[in-house]
């Protein structure tokens, strides 16, 4: 299981209520572009895309996937480069192994991954810290 329905609803609400939530990937767009240029690759999947900032910022077509965001919840096809920014620390502990396997299954060649190692400034609507596994 990638996400429980209860947690999916909490995340939907968090994304809806916080305009700044889900835009962290923009910080890394230049680094991702540099990596893609270095390996001559434009087949990219943004796994956990939130507001799909990479699709807006990068000069080539990006697959945007996020099970918490209805318009991005369709399962993607595997890509040569998978980008996963500010996602894993938000995964429910009991779902982490399945999410990691899912990420592996969608990654053909390379991955660009970030994981926060401190508590988030934001709280979930139920009061828990938004970073569940730090």
Regions found by a protein language model. Give the residues of each.
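A conserved beta-strand element that flanks and buttresses the S-adenosyl-L-methionine
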Residues: 83
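Short glycine-centered segments of the SAM/dcSAM-binding site in methyltransferase folds
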Residues: 109-112
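Conserved N-terminal segment of class I S-adenosyl-L-methionine
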Residues: 1-79, 97-101, 106, 117, ...
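Hydrophobic adenine-recognition pocket in adenosine-nucleotide-binding enzymes
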Residues: 87-90
